């Protein structure tokens, strides 16, 4: 009887140790996931929203619903005849078409 009791205590101890190791692994995975989410959130805060100027940072546009906005540039001619480049973050026409098709597909198929 003492042997069974000793074996049971040993088994419970090993089980609690192994479950503690597994919980530590899960906690580490949760921390890694949280850090990556925080980094993505910081990157989002630094991005340039839609319709805002991106002349100085052409690769810093935010993400839209499906695609990242693209920096679209035009040349603006002033009354004095000088041409300056002005850029803004926007959705290119082919991305608009793809978003329209996806939205239409979601309405039809659910």
From Swiss-Prot:
Location within or outside the cell: Secreted
GO cellular component, one term: extracellular region
Pfam families, A to Z: Toxin_35
Propeptide: 21-44
GO function terms (MF aspect): toxin activity
Keyword Glycoprotein: no
Span of the signal peptide: 1-20
InterPro entries: Spider_toxin_CSTX_knottin, Spider_toxin_CSTX_Knottin_CS
Presence of keyword NADP: no
Segments traversing the membrane: none
Keyword tags: Disulfide bond, Knottin, Secreted, Signal, Toxin
Tissue: Expressed by the venom gland.
SS bonds (residue pairs): 47-62, 54-71, 61-89, 73-87
Main location: secreted
Family that this chain belongs to: Belongs to the neurotoxin 19 (CSTX) family. 03 subfamily.
Domain free text: The presence of a 'disulfide through disulfide knot' structurally defines this protein as a knottin.
Name of the protein described by the UniProt record: U1-lycotoxin-Ls1ll
């Amino acid at each position: 009887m003492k042997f069974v009791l000793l074996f049971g205590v040993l088994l419970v101890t090993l089980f609690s140790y192994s479950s503690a190791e597994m919980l530590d692994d899960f906690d580490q995975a949760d921390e890694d996931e949280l850090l990556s989410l925080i980094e993505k959130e910081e990157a989002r805060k630094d991005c340039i929203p839609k319709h805002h100027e991106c002349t100085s940072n052409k690769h810093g546009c935010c993400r839209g619903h499906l695609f990242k906005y693209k920096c679209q540039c035009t040349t603006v001619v002033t009354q004095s005849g000088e041409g300056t480049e002005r850029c803004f973050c926007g959705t290119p026409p082919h991305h608009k078409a793809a978003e329209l098709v996806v939205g239409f597909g979601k309405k039809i198929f659910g």
